[in-house]
């Protein structure tokens, strides 16, 4: 009785094994590896890493205290009158003293 059950288990496991599936999977992995090798060569020449360290600088101008100047443009109805936001990209310089201060004061466990 047990031998028949073991024999049926072996036949069932052999039927579940699919050799062509293993070949397809192997081919897919090889194709993916080849694509990973070739991908850097296919990128456009204009796609380069930015080497200039620029970051957005946000300046807020508040004229709500009564400072009235000549209006060059018609005031919009969006937002709060008297507030202006200027965003520009500026080069960021390294500050070793500030980096050391952050490391000593904020990077503690």
Curated annotation (Swiss-Prot):
Function field: Light-harvesting photosynthetic tetrapyrrole chromophore-protein from the phycobiliprotein complex.
Binding-site residues for (2R,3E)-phycocyanobilin 3, renumbered to this chain: 16, 20, 27-28, 39
GO annotation, cellular component aspect: chloroplast thylakoid membrane; phycobilisome
Residues that, per the record, bind (2R,3E)-phycocyanobilin 2: 17
Quaternary structure and partners: Heterotetramer of 2 identical alpha chains and 2 identical beta chains which form 2 alpha-beta heterodimers within the heterotetramer. The two alpha-beta heterodimers are rotated to an open configuration in contrast to the closed configuration found in other cryptophyte species due to the insertion of a single amino acid, Asp-65, in a conserved region of the alpha chain. In the open form, the central chromophores are not in physical contact but are separated by a water-filled channel.
Keyword Chloroplast belongs to the record: yes
Keyword Amino-acid biosynthesis appears in the UniProt entry: no
Membership in a protein family: Belongs to the phycoerythrin family.
Misc. comment: The light-harvesting system in Cryptophytes contains phycobiliprotein complexes. Unusually they are composed of either phycoerythrin (CPE) or phycocyanin (CPC) but never allophycocyanin (APC), with only one type of biliprotein being present in any one species. Unlike cyanobacteria or red algae these proteins are not arranged into higher-order phycobilisome complexes, and they are found in the thylakoid lumen.
GO biological process: photosynthesis
Residues the record lists as binding (2R,3E)-phycocyanobilin 1: 6
Stated name of the protein: Phycoerythrin alpha-1 subunit
UniProt modification remark: Contains three phycocyanobilin chromophores with binding mediated by both the alpha and beta subunits.
Topology with respect to the bilayer: Peripheral membrane protein
Lineage: Eukaryota, Cryptophyceae, Cryptomonadales, Hemiselmidaceae, Hemiselmis
Keyword entries, A-Z: Bile pigment, Chloroplast, Chromophore, Electron transport, Membrane, Photosynthesis, Plastid, Thylakoid, Transport
Domain of life: Eukaryota
Compartment(s): Plastid, Chloroplast thylakoid membrane
């Amino acid at each position: 009785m047990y031998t028949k059950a073991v024999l049926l288990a072996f036949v069932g496991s052999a039927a579940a094994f699919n050799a062509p599936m293993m070949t397809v999977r192997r081919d897919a992995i090889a194709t993916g590896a080849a694509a990973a090798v070739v991908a850097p060569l296919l990128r456009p020449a204009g796609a380069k890493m930015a080497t200039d360290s620029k970051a957005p600088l946000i300046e807020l101008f508040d004229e709500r205290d009564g400072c009235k100047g000549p209006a060059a443009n018609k005031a919009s109805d969006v937002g709060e009158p008297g507030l202006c936001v200027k965003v520009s990209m500026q080069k960021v310089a390294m500050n070793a003293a500030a980096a050391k201060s952050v490391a000593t004061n904020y990077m503690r466990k």
